[in-house]
């Protein structure tokens, strides 16, 4: 448990340095609402904390099935972007993306969806695109890269 705490502390210290060096990020993106879909509780908590520290509003789902339900029930414009894990119980990220893309509400169906996964081979990137995702962010997270991708997409 001490190792996990130390890891969280190191990540948050890195985040503090990254975010303080990117004040413009917070100004332009503060309050943007993300849906973070991640089955691993520790990964979910870490990513949520990183994103909140950067100024995002973050809602979470533990698997693809819950993510699809949240999108079906979401008010128009409730979410600006989805960060989707791939390997999850009940419904994986590929199937969840396909179901979100098939929603009758064009705004919900067209939301930017990025794979956020340890599956980092070119084949994995291509599978994400084929499923309808807009891009791929590899884990472990490179915080500056993650924040840059979010900035580029949400501006």
Q: Where is each model-derived feature located?
A:
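C-terminal compact regulatory domains
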Residues: 1-155
